[in-house]
Amino acid sequence: MGILDPYKGFGVTFGTMFKKPTTEQYPEEKKETAPRFHGRHQLNRHPDGLEKCVGCELCAWACPADAIYVEGADNTEAERYSPGERYGRVYQINYLRCILCGLCIEACPTRALTMSNDYELADDSRQDLIFTKEQLLAPLREGMEAPPHPMRLGSSETDYYTRDPDAPLPWQASGQEQVAGQAAELEAADVIARRTAGEHSRADEVPAHGAGSERPR
């Protein structure tokens, strides 16, 4: 042993004395997770409240830990839970088996299943770690209606997946849009009434080559 070896050991000790502690004061202070963190699963809804899950069971087939159980059923006109022909009547995830790998998310064809940032899954009951459909479903937001109910975003399943996601919903038109629509309807009705009465003004004419343009000479 060299004469400097003890000082080298103390150097490591003294160096750690000035480092900031890495201990998190959990659960009082929870660490913020990454945006794409693999946490508890969530079953998503369409903007009208219908479920995105169509009961195809692809997530269960893709699960390497056999942690997902799905039982599908047919929709009817009297009871509709999703826009498709079928919906997930029973949906369970066993978090005693789940390894949070995310393969079920990749297999889902309708983006019905996603992973949240909730990582607090510890429990002292094995039965409570088997999450049911009611526990996994996303909460109802403004404008949503709890199923079963008819389709409100279109007349077919295709309308739900081809609509512009940024477009306003049919029942969520803003006050300005409603006022503008009413003003346009009144203006159109006024023009029709004046034309019916035989009145005609320059303002009622529509230029052949666009508003404000002149006919080329």
UniProtKB/Swiss-Prot annotation:
Provide the cofactor list for this protein: [4Fe-4S] cluster
Output the superkingdom of the source species. Answer: Bacteria
Q: Which stretches does the entry tag as region Disordered?
A: 22-41, 193-217
Q: Give the E.C. number(s).
A: 7.1.1.-
- SUPFAM superfamilies, alphabetically? 4Fe-4S ferredoxins
Query: What InterPro entries does the database record attribute to this sequence?
Result: 4Fe4S_Fe-S-bd, 4Fe4S_Fe_S_CS, NADH_quinone_OxRdtase_chainI
- Family of this protein: Belongs to the complex I 23 kDa subunit family.
- Name recorded for this polypeptide: NADH-quinone oxidoreductase subunit I
In which organism is this protein found?
Answer: Frankia casuarinae (strain DSM 45818 / CECT 9043 / HFP020203 / CcI3)
Gene name in the database record? nuoI
